[in-house]
C-alpha cells in the first residue's frame, strides 16, 4: 500500500483526484485531500478560488466532474445529499423562522419519517450536547447569534453525521461577534468530536480555529499545513502575500539586506523589519500609523518602500532617519528556476 492509499484508509473523508465545477467550466481540478477523524480543516482562499464549490461537491449539492469523494472508505460521489451522512451549516444558519429550535433540529428526522419517540430522544441528545436544552421552545428571532449557531450545529448532527461542513458562517458578523463565534464553534467541535470542514476567505478564522488549512488559489492547492507552518514557512509567493502582511523586496533592496543577489521574488514580514539595528541600512521614515496594539511605520530605503510593525510607544518621527535591519533568517526567498 503506497503512502496516499494509507492516508485515505486512515481518513474519515478523502477527496481523490476530484474535479469540481459546472458543465463546461472546471473550477478546481485534480484535488487530493485526506481529512482525519475529528480534525478541523479550513478551506481558505480568495473569492473565486473554488473553496465553496468544493464544499458543495462534498455535500452532494454540486455534482463532481471527475474523481471521487470517500466517506469512511465508502464512495459517496454519486449519492444524493440526503444519503451522504454529512451535515451542513450555512452562512446565515438557514433556520426556519416560524419553527422553534426543537422543530428546526427535528426537521430532517421528520422528513425521514422517524417515530415521535425517536425524534424526541435524538433531539434531546444533541440539544444537551450543544448546551441548548433550555432553548428548545424558542424561535430563532428570540435567540442570540450564539444560540442560533448551536441550533444549526445540532440540526446538522441530529441525523448522525460525523462530518460537518461550514459554508462561511461568520462572514456577515462584526469583528467582536465573529471572534466570539469562532471560539464557540471550536469549543463545540472539540467537545462533540465531529470532523469540521470550514470554508472561509478570512485568514484569521483559519489561523485561530484549524488543525489543518488548505489554501486554494485559482482552483489549485497552494499549500496545506497548520497555521504556524503557513505563516513561517510559506511554500509560494501567493502564501506570503495572502497569509499575514509582507513586504515584497525589490531585487536591489533584497541584495542589500540579504547580502546576495536574488533572481526571483523575496518577501519580509512587517514584524521582521528591525529599526535601530547596528550597522544597518539608512532608511527614511515617511509615515507612522498607530493601530492600537502595534504601529505601522512606512519607510523609504534607497528609493524603495518598506513597512515595519513596532510594538510599544517608542516610535520614530516622520522625516527622521533610522538604521534598518532584518531578523536573521526571516526573509522568504523564491529563486527563479533556470534550466
Swiss-Prot record:
Topology versus the membrane: Peripheral membrane protein
Alphabetical list of CDD domains matching this protein: ABC_Carb_Solutes_like
GO CC terms: ATP-binding cassette (ABC) transporter complex, substrate-binding subunit-containing
Ligand binding (ATP): 45-52
SUPFAM superfamilies (alphabetical): MOP-like, P-loop containing nucleoside triphosphate hydrolases
TM ranges: none
Domain ABC transporter: from-to ranges: 13-243
Pfam families for this protein: ABC_tran (PF00005), TOBE_2 (PF08402)
GO MF annotation terms: ABC-type ferric iron transporter activity; ATP binding; ATP hydrolysis activity
UniProt cross-references to InterPro entries, sorted A to Z: AAA+_ATPase, ABC_transporter-like_ATP-bd, ABC_transporter-like_CS, ABC_transpr_FbpC, ABC_transpr_MalK/UgpC-like, Mo/tungstate-bd_C_term_dom, P-loop_NTPase, Transp-assoc_OB_typ2
Cellular location(s): Cell inner membrane
Alphabetical UniProt keywords: ATP-binding, Cell inner membrane, Cell membrane, Membrane, Nucleotide-binding, Plasmid, Transport
Family stated for the protein in its record: Belongs to the ABC transporter superfamily.
Function: Probably part of a binding-protein-dependent transport system y4fNOP. Probably responsible for energy coupling to the transport system.
PANTHER family according to UniProt: MALTODEXTRIN IMPORT ATP-BINDING PROTEIN MSMX (PTHR43875), OSMOPROTECTIVE COMPOUNDS UPTAKE ATP-BINDING PROTEIN GGTA (PTHR43875:SF1)
Record's protein name: Uncharacterized ABC transporter ATP-binding protein y4fO
Lineage start: Bacteria, Pseudomonadati, Pseudomonadota, Alphaproteobacteria, Hyphomicrobiales
